[in-house]
């Protein structure tokens, strides 16, 4: 939107005052056409190419400078809570395991000067490493030199340990290279991301910030434009929890903060009346508190859409799992980034995302090379 009135209409949508259809009616049709929301498959890719080609002609775009993206993570992901055992999700029956070939088809057709391909660390070992080797071979075959590194969002100023494989490619003969990144370690704590948000009990919701919250605002949140100049607050709805879960959450938080070693609660540590699962080996680390007093927390996962036991809010007075907005802040999303759909879908969006602070640094480095 190019003026303040249109900008305010987005807030009306976020507040639920107008429908999505009413909002889209106010956006110029030529802009809406540039957003292509279609499933990627062999059956649809030709039509997607045709749509892109039409847009290129209408906007008189000759060359594509850069393509950025990556197939959905789940097909290559280390299994949620079994990450420590390095188990890989079975891929043979998952159609998403071929999506990297779709990505290469875009490279082959549009020949961007550079590209960025992002995925989870598990892609390197999926199918014994064959999928990753094939991907690199296909990229080179269509005319690219490539390099890859496993990068951690924590090194980009994000208050979260989040490892991702980033492949950068450039057309042969262009002289580009894999960017070098300066490590950015913030002195902030994860608490700084949570303190100024309204406190919630299980099942409660807050739809706006308060002046009290503003007084708790931390430098990290202001400096990185996470808190915006608006009272609108979306996605800050706490899940309801059973009395049993609440009691377990309190014990989990207590154990984390009661000693400097920050011990995690193990399932067998619970009294018998709180143990409901027979397979206790699988649930050994089922409950985990977000590390509020540290400079980073564990990786935000799409599994948040299933339950929040692995992401318990560190404030024992709130005794609940984190909200979509809190997860988004840990991912470094600004508060005015609106997640659509039901809460489960929002958690999936947040859990699968690249942290914006990390993405911006990578994008700036790519832009520097393209502008030389």
Give the label of every model feature segment.
Residues 54-61, 78-277:
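Class I S-adenosyl-L-methionine
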Residues 2, 182-184, 314-318:
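Short Gly/aromatic-enriched secondary-structure transition segments
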Residues 220-372:
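C-terminal target-recognition/interaction regions appended to catalytic cores
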Residues 1-111, 121-125, 130:
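Core alpha/beta nucleotide-donor-binding catalytic domains of modification enzymes
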Residues 71-80, 171, 304, 334-335:
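Short, small-residue-rich loop/turn micro-motifs
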Residues 65-66, 113-114, 297-299:
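Beta-sheet entry/capping signal
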């Amino acid at each position: 939107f190019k003026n303040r009135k249109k900008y305010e209409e987005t807030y009306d949508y976020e507040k639920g005052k107008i429908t999505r259809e009413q909002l889209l009616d106010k956006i110029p049709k030529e802009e809406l056409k540039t957003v292509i929301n279609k499933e990627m498959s062999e059956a649809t890719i030709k039509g997607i190419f045709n749509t892109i080609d039409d847009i290129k002609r209408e906007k008189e775009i000759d060359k594509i400078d850069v393509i950025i993206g990556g197939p959905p993570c789940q097909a290559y992901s280390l299994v949620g809570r079994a990450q420590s055992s390095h188990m890989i999700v079975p891929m043979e029956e998952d159609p998403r395991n071929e999506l990297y070939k779709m990505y290469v088809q875009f490279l082959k057709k549009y020949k961007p000067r550079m590209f960025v391909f992002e995925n989870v660390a598990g892609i390197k070992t999926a199918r014994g490493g064959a999928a990753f080797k094939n991907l690199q071979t296909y990229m080179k075959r269509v005319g690219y030199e490539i390099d890859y590194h496993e990068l951690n969002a924590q090194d980009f100023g994000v208050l979260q340990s989040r490892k991702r494989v980033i492949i950068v490619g450039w057309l042969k003969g262009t002289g580009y290279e894999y960017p070098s990144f300066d490590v950015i370690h913030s002195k902030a704590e994860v608490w700084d991301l949570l303190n100024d948000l309204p406190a919630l009990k299980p099942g409660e919701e807050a739809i706006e910030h308060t002046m009290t919250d503003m007084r708790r605002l931390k430098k990290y949140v202001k400096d990185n434009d996470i808190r915006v100049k608006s009272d609108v607050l979306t996605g800050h709805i706490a899940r309801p929890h059973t009395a049993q879960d609440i009691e377990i959450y309190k014990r989990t938080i207590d154990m984390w903060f009661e000693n400097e070693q920050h011990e995690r609660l193990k399932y067998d540590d619970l009294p018998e009346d709180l143990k409901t699962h027979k397979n206790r080996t699988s649930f050994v680390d089922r409950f985990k508190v977000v590390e509020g007093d540290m400079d980073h927390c564990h990786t935000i996962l799409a599994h948040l859409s299933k339950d929040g036991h692995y992401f318990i809010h560190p404030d024992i007075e709130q005794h609940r799992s984190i909200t979509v907005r809190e997860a988004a802040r840990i991912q470094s999303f600004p508060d005015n980034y609106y997640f659509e759909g039901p809460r489960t879908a929002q958690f999936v969006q947040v859990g699968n995302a690249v942290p914006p602070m990390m993405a911006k640094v990578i994008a700036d480095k790519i832009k520097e090379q393209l502008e030389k």
